[in-house]
Amino acid sequence: MEVFKNVVCPFCGTLCDDIEVLVENNHVVGTRNACRIGNAKFMHFEGAIRHESPLMRENKKDDFKKVDYETATEETARLLVEAKLPLIYGWSSAECHAQQLGVLLAEKTKAIVDNTASVUHGPSLLAVQDVGYPVSTLGETKNRADVVLFWGSNPMHAHPRHMSRYSVFPRGFFRQRGKQDRQMIVVDPRKTDTAKLADIHLQVEPHKDYELVSALRAAAKGFNIEAEQVAGVPTETIYEAVDICKNAQFGSLFFAMGVTMSRGKHRIIDNAIQFVIDMNAYTKFVLTPMRGHYNVNGFNQVSTWVTGYPYGVDFSRGYPRYNPGETASNDVLQRGDTDMMINVASDAGAHFPQKAVQHMAKIPLVCIDPHETPSSVISNIVLPPAITGLEVSGTAYRMDGVPIELRKVIKAPEGMLSDAEIMKMLIKKVDEMK
């Protein structure tokens, strides 16, 4: 049995890089240090329905037929070239080189390229563009933070090692006693497992986050809040939370989809960032979005470097345009604008609204995914890639914007191509057809 040390876990945005993977006869038989979700990521592909070769069918009611990569990519390229407005969506579980090639493919085919941020942390990116990004690395939080604030976030379930590795429990350079040296504030409508560990739980009413942030900012600036409670939180608790934040040596605010998908969307995050800026008049305070997929941040970084825009980039006029609400994947699907779609390293069929999925079922759909998913079931073509972070190396961006190299621990099935190799084939075929 071979033990691979310091392997990066390709599941969530925490990108834990201390995993040990146990390999026997080119099969993963176990892991060490990984959380339950990370362990399942390394182990589940053994039991999941995995596509061994590309599949094709003309009619979605027919059965799939096995073909080779050459045939499948040629048909995909033909569909791309003939489409009036193709959509290339996903990318959050692919490595950065494949993402960069995907943006190039979208440019060549005058497509819309979008990633899963448009249905999760898209509002965060809009807010950052509006008012700034007072961010730090997770290492700084671990070593310096004595106040940690989780807003609309439940890392105990969503990012299980976040609190133990970076934010609350670890012993840092200036926080030698770990949790004893830190105070923890949680803002959540429910008494989550994370909230149960908090020193202060601000149990905000659903969709009242904007009011609560505004009250925190007012209290921080010395205004007298006349109401007995704001957004369901007692005024005295608001003042207590603000005092803790003001007196911190280093404060760190982590926010997740509880905020981005609350009523007000990016305007709430605008306000939260302004609260962090206000706090910097008294102490050092930073914020970090709790990104979900392990490389959702990577696509936003790559797309911004290449096109100037983080997601929902429309190349239909030959140059990049960006207008979330018009050019994002859900918008074009629900309006019925797109006439061909490629789903890459994500599962739109499982997570998009019914109206969007109904349109996906009507149009030619290509799925680039190693396993059977609700998206692949309604596809015309399935192009299975090798699994990044397990069978292929590459680069991914952690939630705080730190790039980390993913490792290869086992060999991919014979003849299986990586996401980047599939993209290269598609670009070559498109160039030949144009």
UniProtKB/Swiss-Prot annotation:
It catalyses: N-formylmethanofuran + 2 oxidized [2Fe-2S]-[ferredoxin] + H2O = methanofuran + 2 reduced [2Fe-2S]-[ferredoxin] + CO2 + H(+). Its EC number is 1.2.7.12. It is an enzyme of class 1 (oxidoreductase). Pathway: One-carbon metabolism; methanogenesis from CO(2); 5,10-methenyl-5,6,7,8-tetrahydromethanopterin from CO(2): step 1/3. GO terms for biological process: methanogenesis, from carbon dioxide; respiratory electron transport chain. CDD domains: MopB_FmdB-FwdB. The keyword Ion transport does not apply. Its cofactor is W-bis(molybdopterin guanine dinucleotide). Keywords: Methanogenesis, Oxidoreductase, Selenocysteine, Tungsten. It comes from the Archaea. GO terms for molecular function: formylmethanofuran dehydrogenase activity; NADH dehydrogenase activity. GO terms for cellular component: membrane. The keyword Disulfide bond does not apply. It holds the Pfam family Molybdopterin. Coiled coil: none annotated. Belongs to the FwdB family. This enzyme is composed of six subunits FwdA, FwdC, FwdD, FwdE, FwdF and FwdG. Catalyzes the reversible oxidation of CO(2) and methanofuran (MFR) to N-formylmethanofuran (CHO-MFR). This enzyme is oxygen-labile. This is Tungsten-containing formylmethanofuran dehydrogenase 2 subunit B.
